[in-house]
Amino acid sequence: MLKRALISVFNKEGIVDFAKFLVNKGVEIISTGGTYKHLKENNIPVTEVNEVTGFDEILDGRVKTLHPAIHGGILAIRDNKEHMSIIENKGIKPIDMVVVNLYPFFEKVKEDLEFQEKIEFIDIGGPTMIRAAAKNFKDVVVLTDTKDYSDVMDQIEKNNEVNYDTRKRLAGKVFNLMASYDAAISNFLLEDTEYPENLALSYTKSMDLRYGENSHQSAACYTANNGKGIMNNIEILNGKQLSYNNIKDMDIAWKVVWEFDDIACCGLKHNTPCGVALGENVHDAYLKAYSCDPVSIFGGIVAFNRKVDKKTAEEMVKIFLEIVIAPDFDSDALEVLKTKKNLRVIKCNTKPEDNFNIAKVDGAILVQSEDKLFAEKMEVVTDKKPTEEELKELTFAMKVCKYTKSNAIVVSKGCVAVGIGGGQVNRIWAAEEALERGEGATVLASDAFFPFDDVVKTAAKHGIKAIIQPGGSIRDKDSIKACNENDISMVFTGIRHFKH
């Protein structure tokens, strides 16, 4: 039987109706600060917490409910005679329900506030109360989510009580919330610490997904509570719900186009680029990216690093695409794209922000810094030196190579990735794949060094004029010799770009 409830909420949504319901069921309401005033203004009988504690709030509201009269009433086990005798002797009444939602640290940490202003949104009293209530969930109902009000009211209406399973579930939500809340605070304070002793992640479920990589796998999307990253800053302008594979592919395509200051377009399928190009405008960039592999781009994702115009939109709707993502769309371009009702049109107003990459293995999580370093040096190791135009082309090809599964080879012509070979267990197969597709290519990029000179010799047969690779093989001299014999320039970067 519920007799007393403590209500202290930052988010006032639904609280007046909920409190009225409790009062009508004979429940005494205790409240604090702003919540007390809000309930009072809505003519709800309410007792201010200092009347219970006999102690006024202090330190600008930092200390309101941290008192034995509150926590004794929450933590006392009702069927423990000693507990009940102690609180009775101390004049403490049991508290049967705690309704609290926390200071909005998740939201405030994203805002452009001073450090100390953000600190003030770290809740202390609220977490202490809900943790106490959750520990004693058998005797105390704890609510932290406005979405749970209706279910609790239904149960009280029907049974005059809240059942054990619901109490347990609500208690579990408390510790789940607190783990994420504390992780967000920890990450904020340790933002300059690369690898803390304990890894605390703070993400909130933003959507349930239809399924995972395959239809028999369940999936959901959780977004970072710090507000950073692509998934926190997208606007879906058209199309159906994003899928698990859509999100993974979109992430890579977006990262590819933002490797470049020039106008860029990336076509991507199965987490691998199938066409990447720079262009004079978005239409030119799209046509060039499409030309790299007109077959594979079908059913894929297209990303741009500039606003999309109508002319480009009219080209894209000629084929089936899953997603088009760009910083913005002209209004007439959007009208054209919306003629494809299932095409997901995504506007994203932020560049990629990931600094770390996380991979899960059985029983562990692996964390590494993002592969953002391009080259320690651009060392020409051959007799022939690449031209300035070839250096630009080599840089382009290597940046595409970075996002291609290893072993990866990319061949390019005119800053168009005409041949992409990836995911091969040996480098020569990747080279053969890229070169066979990349007719007319003039430069070649490799994500790792050449263990033998076979790639150079094969490249020479296909008319390659310049090569970029990390270097570092014990047989580098063999590849250099083969380049010199075939009038090919080659540069070493000193940086490997494996992608597994």
Swiss-Prot record:
Signal peptide as annotated in the record: none
Cross-referenced SUPFAM superfamilies: Cytidine deaminase-like, Methylglyoxal synthase-like
Keywords: Hydrolase, Multifunctional enzyme, Purine biosynthesis, Transferase
E.C. designation(s): 2.1.2.3, 3.5.4.10
Domain MGS-like span(s) in chain numbering: 1-144
Catalytic reaction list: (6R)-10-formyltetrahydrofolate + 5-amino-1-(5-phospho-beta-D-ribosyl)imidazole-4-carboxamide = 5-formamido-1-(5-phospho-D-ribosyl)imidazole-4-carboxamide + (6S)-5,6,7,8-tetrahydrofolate; IMP + H2O = 5-formamido-1-(5-phospho-D-ribosyl)imidazole-4-carboxamide
Keyword Transferase included in the entry's annotation: yes
Gene3D superfamilies associated with the record: 3.40.140.20, Methylglyoxal synthase-like domain
Gene Ontology BP terms: 'de novo' IMP biosynthetic process
Gene Ontology molecular function, alphabetical: IMP cyclohydrolase activity; phosphoribosylaminoimidazolecarboxamide formyltransferase activity
PROSITE patterns listed in its UniProt record: MGS
Pathway per the UniProt entry: Purine metabolism; IMP biosynthesis via de novo pathway; 5-formamido-1-(5-phospho-D-ribosyl)imidazole-4-carboxamide from 5-amino-1-(5-phospho-D-ribosyl)imidazole-4-carboxamide (10-formyl THF route): step 1/1; Purine metabolism; IMP biosynthesis via de novo pathway; IMP from 5-formamido-1-(5-phospho-D-ribosyl)imidazole-4-carboxamide: step 1/1
A GO CC annotation given for this chain: cytosol
Alphabetical list of InterPro entries matching this protein: AICAR_Tfase_dup_dom_sf, Cytidine_deaminase-like, MGS-like_dom, MGS-like_dom_sf, PurH-like
Family assignment from sequence similarity: Belongs to the PurH family.
PANTHER family, alphabetized: BIFUNCTIONAL PURINE BIOSYNTHESIS PROTEIN ATIC, BIFUNCTIONAL PURINE BIOSYNTHESIS PROTEIN PURH
NCBIfam families named in the record: PRK00881.1, purH
Protein name, per record: Bifunctional purine biosynthesis protein PurH
UniProt organism field: Clostridium novyi (strain NT)
